[in-house]
Structure formats: structure tokens, C-alpha cells
Amino acid sequence: MTCDVSPLFGTDGIRGRANFEPMTVETSVLLGKAVAGVLLERHSGKHRVVVGKDTRLSGYMFENALIAGLTSMGIETLMLGPIPTPGVAFITRAYRADAGIMISASHNPYRDNGIKIFSSDGFKIGQAVEERIEAMIASKSFGGLPEDHAVGKNKRVKDAMGRYIEYAKATFPKGRTLKGLRIVLDCAHGAAYRVAPSVFEELDAEVICYGCEPSGCNINEGCGALWPSIIQKAVIEHEADVGIALDGDGDRLIMVDEKGHIVDGDMLLSICASDLKRRQALPENRVVATVMTNFGVLRYLESLGIQVTISPVGDRHVLQHMLETKAILGGEQSGHMIFLDYNTTGDGIVSALQVLRIMIESESTLSDLTACIVKSPQSLINVPVAKKVPLDSLSNVQVVLQEVKEILGDSGRILLRYSGTENICRVMVEGTKKHQVDSLAKTIVDVVEAEIGGAEISE
């Protein structure tokens, strides 16, 4: 196999099908060396890097490959085992490590895998560092190799999950419990399969678990945040108070109310923003949302006197805008929620705890908390594509977009964009009438499929 390294990094780290470039063992060893090289450029001496993963079968080989590359350069590595992505960010800070690495393809199917890299402060590395890593791999110039006793060693951190569990519980008010709440929890057979049940059970909730039996090949398969229909049915069947669905690496959250209705990231953001403003704990009454955020949600937030900064899609962009505007809360429709008071990245478990706290303190059901939020009709369809051709170069697509815009007028909008992590084109149409937006979205989808449709191939 050859090492095609240009470019390695996408919108959320490195991602692709396991054993296909860039997600090969060979490239992962080089990546480990390059991360070490960047650290050693900053200062010589000892460095520590923590390495976590989700439950994919291919995680074992990438874990070993990355650790081999790092230790060959004299870096000490701390192996965390299966743990949510926000757990890696937290433990990187807690252990005063120089970097953290998470091996995961998030919500993608098990055949894919990916690598996310965190700096010592727990934030994902920036573009400049990514480019330096890519340059090192391209040139295979990492600096001198250590000799004899100077090579690095690897240690397994036995209490990594326990540390993260205690951290997550500490974001819930002391003296309060979840006693009396029946929760349906879907962990997508992913990284949170042991952590999440423990957090909620130790806070005295009754937890009914789904998606907590990973096989290495079933992560995100018909379950988790991408398939909330599982917990919709389960909440009704078990007469539960709430449903919680996480994705494969535990950084996304979708909830279901006691009536079986989905509460997506837009609505969860609204609930938490409203609570923070009520408690006068929302700096400048500002939150960050994305271009996908429902217009009805934006109107609701604005009616509360909350200013909304709009960012491109992706938790990286949300975080960047949060830092620029000094916001402490941001999120997106897909379920990424960032509470900067607690963590440096999206955290599904911590986000769920904040919503549960609001329910308990206000003595409200989840449906009570969403009752005053009226969403605009919106249709979102994912179209698998053979390859990502620039959309403005597709004349038939541009023609149908213009036709749909004229039909919607000022009462609606269209958003057409490629996924940053999969070979998918996302078609979103929003308006005032549900049947109309569904029909118009289907019209656009038909043209996109005719132009560039194909079997789904993850990046």
C-alpha cells in the first residue's frame, strides 16, 4: 500500500474506510511520528500523549499503530481504551498531557474509522498544526530517533472510565439526584456503552439500556443518535420519562420526550439557553447555532432576548464562533452541544445531564419544556454521491435550485452542502407548509441523484 497523504485532515480530523487510505496502519504509524515531531519541535524532553478509541474492530490496529509511531519518537503514551471523545479531551487536561488522540469515526458505520487530535488544553488542534503534521508525513522528516532507554513506553490507564464518570457527575448539582426518573438510554454500541449507564445509574435513575452490547461491527447500526426511532418506541413501551440517544463516540445527543416525540439539538439548545438566561448565567445573552438551525427555533430564542451567532455546520466551527464571541453555549441540530463551562468539545452525557437538571428544577416534563417552541416545517435528506463535484458546476442542479427558490420566495430557504465526513450531499428545504417542503426537497434530490448519485462511500 502507498501513503497518499494529501490531504489527510477533513472537517473533523482524519476519517475514512479502515485499511484504505488515509486510514491505514502505515499512515497511522507516520501520523504518530508526526504528532511526536510537532511536540518535540516545541521543546525537547519528555512528552505524554493519551490515546482513546471507540468500539470499532479496527480500533485495535490503529491504537497499536499510533502508539508505535509515538513511542518510537520517545513519547510516553497513556492508553485509555474505549471512552467517549469528550472523555479524551477531559483526561488530556486532567493528566496534563501534551496531546490527546481519539480513534473514532463518530456516527459513521463500523467499516470506517478516524482520528481526532487534541492539544494540551483539550481543544482540537487547529489548521496550522494539521498542515505541519501533513508536511512532516509528506517529507517523512520527523526529527532524530531516540536510542536505547530514550524510546517511549506505553501504559494502560486503568481508571480512565472512572475518572470520566466522576467528572460527568460533577456537572450535576450536588445534593440533587435523578431518583424517580426512568430513562431509556441508547449508546449506539459505541464508546459510551459502559460510561453512560454508570453516570445515570449512580445518580439514582432507573436506566433501561439499548445499544450497550458492542461487537466491534455494530456501532451506529440502526441505533443511537442517528436512529432515535428505537428509543421513541422504547419510551412508550416502558412508560419512561425521557429517552437519551448518543452516537458512536458520545459527543452527540438526541432526546425523546415522555410522549415519544424527538427533541433534536436545536430544541435542546433552546432549552439550555433559556435556562441559562433565566439564571443570568448566559454572558451577553448569546449562543452559537448553525446555518442548519430551524427558523422557528431562532425566532423563539430571539423572542427571549437571546442573541444568536450563526456558524457553518460542524462542532469545530461552532466552537470557533463561541471563542470569538465569548459564548459559553453552542450547538447544532445534529446534537452536538458544547458547554464551555464544562468541556472543550461536544459531550452527549454532560448535555443530557443539563437537560435533566432543568426538568427536575422546574418540575417539568421534557414535553413541557418544548411546548412553546414552534419549529418551521423542514425537510432534510441525505443523498449518497459517487464523488463531491463542486455544486455550482452542476447546471441542472443550479436550475432546480433557482426554481425552488422562486416557489419559496421570502418564506423559505434551501441549503445544499456536502458532508465533511461522508460522501453525502445534504439537501435541506424549509418553509411554511410541510407538504410543500417535502415535495420540493424530493425534487432537488431527484436532480442531485441523477447528476452525481452513487453508492455511499465514506471518506
Curated annotation (Swiss-Prot):
Residue sites binding Mg(2+) per the record: 106, 247, 249, 251
Enzyme Commission no: 5.4.2.10
EC top class named in words: isomerase
Protein keywords: Isomerase, Magnesium, Metal-binding, Phosphoprotein
SUPFAM superfamilies listed in its UniProt record: Phosphoglucomutase, C-terminal domain, Phosphoglucomutase, first 3 domains
GO molecular function, one term: phosphoglucosamine mutase activity
Annotated function: Catalyzes the conversion of glucosamine-6-phosphate to glucosamine-1-phosphate.
Protein name: Phosphoglucosamine mutase
Native source species: Chlamydia muridarum (strain MoPn / Nigg)
Classification lineage: Bacteria, Pseudomonadati, Chlamydiota, Chlamydiia, Chlamydiales
Record gene name: glmM
